[in-house]
Amino acid sequence: MNDNVILTEKKDAVLLITINRPEKLNALNANVLDALKDTLEIFLKDDTLKGAIITGSGEKAFVAGADISGFLKGDRNMGADFAAKGQTLFSSIENASKPIIAAVNGFALGGGCELAMSCHFRIASENAKFGQPEINLGIIPGYGGTQRLTRLVGKGRAMELMMTGENIDAQEALRIGLVNHVCKQEDLLTLAETKMKTITSKSRVALTQIIIATNAADENPEEGMKTEALCFGKSFASDDMVEGVTAFLEKRKANFK
């Protein structure tokens, strides 16, 4: 689709989504964003798919940033539109009703770091590098980086990363909570698939409500608690709850559909 800038592979109930511009270190441009948006819509509509993994083509980069080759031709309105397009897509990933993991296989810089942060959690290879180097271009993160990075690692660390434009390695990203796991490059997809297999064996209803309720933690505490209560009610009234509780009482593994 769209010149094969996005590759997809279905593995059982999991969709592997690969950003495929290795010659450009998988940099994001309008074509990639459009193709990723189309892929996300297909994924969410397909009831046979329970989760997705996003990664980059090759061993050098997850996504090394946005393709800045056209920036000098733009103006303020173009910049705002460019940011809004990415923000809308990445918010759709963050709020997707199915779990999405980022398997970060190299450079995740600028828009690439922002894409990884929009996923529900991140697994990184040992050679991964993270950063928001936009300040070196005289701009700021525009795809939600100022917001998500702050929420993930705290205001002080986020300010430092964005103000210095410096990159951090996978171990530092793990230490500050930007990623959940670090592994060898050759083990990255295996680990991501193993985690996703565990996740997708759980209740679909509960997974969706966990995403909604956890994202509501970004609201004020009172509103977040209200959202959690509503989400708990939806899961409590589901067939999955009946199966889960029955299986527990019968001392067997739950069989969620």
Where are the model-predicted features located?
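Well-ordered beta-strand positions
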Residues: 121, 160, 164-166, 172, ...
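C-terminal long alpha-helix characteristic of the crotonase
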Residues: 22, 123-128, 179-227, 233, ...
